[in-house]
Regions:
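Fe(II)/2-oxoglutarate oxygenase catalytic core
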Residues: 1-172, 180-243
């Protein structure tokens, strides 16, 4: 019988400490130097400044590093590393039957999230899955890299399996984002060197020929890039399901 370890994989040392630190430094620099551009391009913030309902109670300060030139070199290096990690994941999980894996697939744009320590409310999503609507059903794999570990707690927890993945700087965690992998982020706590937990992530998609999934450089973008599949959905349909 397969357990959580069959399709959930941890790869330590995936990103070097220096690359992790540089991502965090550039993230903070971007929020300071390009704060208005960050707000203008954010899918989490409405034009009136209110919270987008698709984010639920999340307060992750999400940032798209592909939209800012200072991340370009890091993103190219990360894309190459992620591509190799996916090939290793396929081998490690013994995915050998052709129908199990698409011949072509897309990568969602990278996103960095920051969760501040000791926030009991809005620290992140409670029990959830990353595929909860038709628009999200193109996702079939999640890749997440922990950029720091200088805090207590902050694990990724799977309640059904009663299993946790502990953040470790440079650690890559790969897992399916579907309904059967319910999970949540445990809030990070003090003592903490930076007062926050940072990670960078993406999803693999069944092929979707939209601009959202094309290329690493989105620095010329002038407005938030919403998934075309969501355009005809109401706010109620897009809202994060309440537990």
């Amino acid at each position: 019988m397969a357990d959580i370890d069959q399709y959930c994989r941890v790869y330590d040392g995936f990103l070097s400490p220096s690359d992790c630190e540089e991502y965090i430094e550039k993230y903070e620099e971007t929020l300071h130097v390009d704060n208005q551009k960050w707000k203008d391009l954010s899918v989490c913030i409405e034009k009136d400044g209110s919270k987008n309902p698709t984010c639920g109670g999340c307060n992750c300060d999400r940032l798209g590093p592909m939209e800012f030139e200072r991340f370009n070199n890091l993103n190219q290096k990360l894309m190459k590393a992620w591509d190799g990690a996916v090939r290793k994941y396929i081998d490690d999980c013994q995915i050998v039957i052709p129908v199990q894996w698409p011949k072509e697939f897309g990568w969602e744009e990278f996103r960095i999230k920051r969760f501040k320590v000791n926030e009991e409310e809005n620290h992140g999503l409670e029990d959830h899955v990353d595929v909860y609507s038709h628009a999200h059903a193109k996702r079939f794999l999640c890749l997440m890299v922990y950029l720091n570990d200088d805090f207590e707690d902050g694990e990724t927890y799977f309640p059904i399996f009663e299993s946790k993945v502990k953040p470790k700087q440079g650690r890559l965690f790969i897992f399916p984002p579907t309904w059967n992998y319910l999970h949540r982020g445990i809030p990070p706590r003090n003592p903490s060197g930076r007062g926050a937990k940072y990670f960078i992530m993406t999803h693999l998609n069944y092929i979707d020929l939209t601009n959202v999934n094309k290329g690493l450089d989105q620095t010329k973008r002038k407005a938030a890039a919403y998934d075309p599949n969501t355009k005809k959905m109401t706010k109620e349909q897009l809202s994060w399901p309440k537990s």
